[in-house]
UniProtKB/Swiss-Prot annotation:
HAMAP family the record matches: IF_1 (MF_00075)
Keywords assigned: Cytoplasm, Initiation factor, Protein biosynthesis, RNA-binding, rRNA-binding
S1-like domain sequence ranges: 1-72
Organism: Fusobacterium nucleatum subsp. nucleatum (strain ATCC 25586 / DSM 15643 / BCRC 10681 / CIP 101130 / JCM 8532 / KCTC 2640 / LMG 13131 / VPI 4355)
Protein name: Translation initiation factor IF-1
PROSITE patterns referenced in this protein's UniProt entry, alphabetically: S1_IF1_TYPE
Subunit record text: Component of the 30S ribosomal translation pre-initiation complex which assembles on the 30S ribosome in the order IF-2 and IF-3, IF-1 and N-formylmethionyl-tRNA(fMet); mRNA recruitment can occur at any time during PIC assembly.
Chief place of localization: cytoplasm
Function: One of the essential components for the initiation of protein synthesis. Stabilizes the binding of IF-2 and IF-3 on the 30S subunit to which N-formylmethionyl-tRNA(fMet) subsequently binds. Helps modulate mRNA selection, yielding the 30S pre-initiation complex (PIC). Upon addition of the 50S ribosomal subunit IF-1, IF-2 and IF-3 are released leaving the mature 70S translation initiation complex.
Gene3D superfamilies per the UniProt record, alphabetical: Nucleic acid-binding proteins
Family to which the UniProt record says this protein belongs: Belongs to the IF-1 family.
One GO cellular component, as annotated: cytosol
Amino acid sequence: MSKKDVIELEGTIVEALPNAMFKVELENGHTILGHISGKMRMNYIKILPGDGVTVQISPYDLSRGRIVYRKKN
């Protein structure tokens, strides 16, 4: 799957789960399961409930996504 096939959406972290997984509430009201991307792990970027994030979702499984960016605020 290439980068142009992914869907990027904005959301807010609702809950932190084990194994670096998070429940993310998207702007459209849906709640998905998200994991941290490898670059965010390498740079030790911490994510807490309430943070605004950008999530990439595969068109094949719309219930899971990859957290690729944490907003500044």
